[in-house]
Amino acid sequence: MRAQWIARRHGQPNVTQMHHARRGSVTEEMAHVAAREKLDPELVRQEVARGRMVIPANLKHPELEPIAIGIAATCKINANIGNSAVTSDVDEELRKLSVCLRHGADTVMDLSTGGDIPLIRENILRHSPIPVGTVPIYECLAHVKDVVDLTPRGLLEIIEAQAAQGVDYMTIHAGVLRDIVPMAAGRITGIVSRGGALLARWMAANGQENPLYTHFDEICEIFKRYDVTFSLGDGLRPGCLADASDEAQFAELKVLGELTRKAWAHDVQVMVEGPGHVPLDQIPMNMQKERELCDEAPFYVLGPLVTDIAPGYDHITSAIGAAVAAQHGASMLCYVTPAEHLGLPDAEDVRQGIVAYKIAAHAADVARQRPGARDRDDALSRARYAFDWKRQFELSLDPDAARTKHDATLPQEAAKSAEFCSMCGPKFCSMRIHSHLGDGAAPGAALPCADAAPSQPTRAGGPLPIAR
């Protein structure tokens, strides 16, 4: 779809969406996302120029259908896939990608840490019409025996190779600095970001500053050549409620704000990653803090999980926090699956995580009163009142699940036109009863009254006592 758009920008000194937006140009990608979001293309251009919206769209990813991530757009969700050093299978990752696409993930991140990482990523990119993100330090680690052996040049080479392959956005943990890491020493769970922990160990062993920070301008130059979007990683995010909103988290966030402005000086797009595990009451404050420190760059949050006691159900604990975060300004939600904290998610875990987060994102869009956000809810409600079961299934977030649940107790085809489900049956279905009230159910109508005044309620042996 984008091949001709990309060809027209070939050879230009700066190809980024932000660069064109700041020059007053509405690119084809901007016009496309404006149509998808039902926004004025000029508003999209202004938001991209200001840095409040990003369109992750690497020139080397022509298969991509662009999307917008930002406060003016609908809330997006990301699904993580990728193998581990324990299990590696290209076909399984493509199955996961298929699940992501079928259930409506807006972006996908390949977090592979084992096997032939470039091959897995190449397959995902060539099959993905949605933006693909990565965490480059994972592949870097596959090239050395120990993280302490990483070199700045090796990091930059991997980043360049991934950009040239077509990766649309990359998590860069450039805010984990030597003077901030000790602030996490008193935490219950310490550093829970893999990238953050690896870089902390590298700095401790080498006695040098974070190479992603010291070479940030060089990374900007790479991103500028391909139009890769920064996803500034929160390497010091809290990993439990007790560690939330602490000194380390906000010290890193302040650095991420500085790096955001530095990337913008290169006309490179930026979104900022956020926590993590956060008590429900602290989420609005965390969203406000990011807006202040990072100049309203789109906030991309992992959950946050609002309780630590539910392994196996963390797609639920985190979706609760995600809905609140999105209501208060988060632009993209990184899903969590039932396998979180327990193991590598399979395709079914991926499906459950996506569905939970689609619900959270949609609930936030409704709460923020985005134009048209509630249209599907209202259409499904009308179908429900009309007992149009097939239409209800079609409008459902997960049609297969809705149909399966219904058919488990009423599998007959005749049940698809029945005015009841197996919960209430025909005698107790409130909507069926109401729909048969006739004229009395019309707006402004009054139900008919008996001519005589009601008699005092009685029971055998005398009148019922009246409570006072």
Curated annotation (Swiss-Prot):
Q: Which GO terms describe its biological process?
A: thiamine biosynthetic process; thiamine diphosphate biosynthetic process
Q: Which residues bind Zn(2+)?
A: H277, H341
Cofactors, names only: [4Fe-4S] cluster
Q: In which pathway does it act?
A: Cofactor biosynthesis; thiamine diphosphate biosynthesis
Gene Ontology cellular-component terms for this entry are: cytosol
- By its UniProt entry, which InterPro entries does this protein fall under? ThiC, ThiC/Bza_core_dom, ThiC/BzaA/B
Under which EC number(s) is this enzyme classified? 4.1.99.17
**What are the entry keywords?**
4Fe-4S, Iron, Iron-sulfur, Lyase, Metal-binding, S-adenosyl-L-methionine, Thiamine biosynthesis, Zinc
Residues binding [4Fe-4S] cluster are C421, C424, C429
Which reaction is recorded as catalysed by this protein?
5-amino-1-(5-phospho-beta-D-ribosyl)imidazole + S-adenosyl-L-methionine = 4-amino-2-methyl-5-(phosphooxymethyl)pyrimidine + CO + 5'-deoxyadenosine + formate + L-methionine + 3 H(+)
Recorded GO molecular functions are:
4 iron, 4 sulfur cluster binding; carbon-carbon lyase activity; zinc ion binding
* Residues involved in substrate binding: N80, M109, Y138, H173, S193, R194, G195, D234, G235, L236, R237, E273, Y300
Which top class of enzyme applies to this chain?
Answer: lyase
- Explain how, and how many, cofactor molecules are bound: Binds 1 [4Fe-4S] cluster per subunit. The cluster is coordinated with 3 cysteines and an exchangeable S-adenosyl-L-methionine.
Q: Which family does it belong to?
A: Belongs to the ThiC family.
Summarize the subunit comment.
Homodimer.
Q: What does this protein do?
A: Catalyzes the synthesis of the hydroxymethylpyrimidine phosphate (HMP-P) moiety of thiamine from aminoimidazole ribotide (AIR) in a radical S-adenosyl-L-methionine (SAM)-dependent reaction.
Name of the protein in its database record:
Phosphomethylpyrimidine synthase
Organism per entry: Anaeromyxobacter sp. (strain Fw109-5)
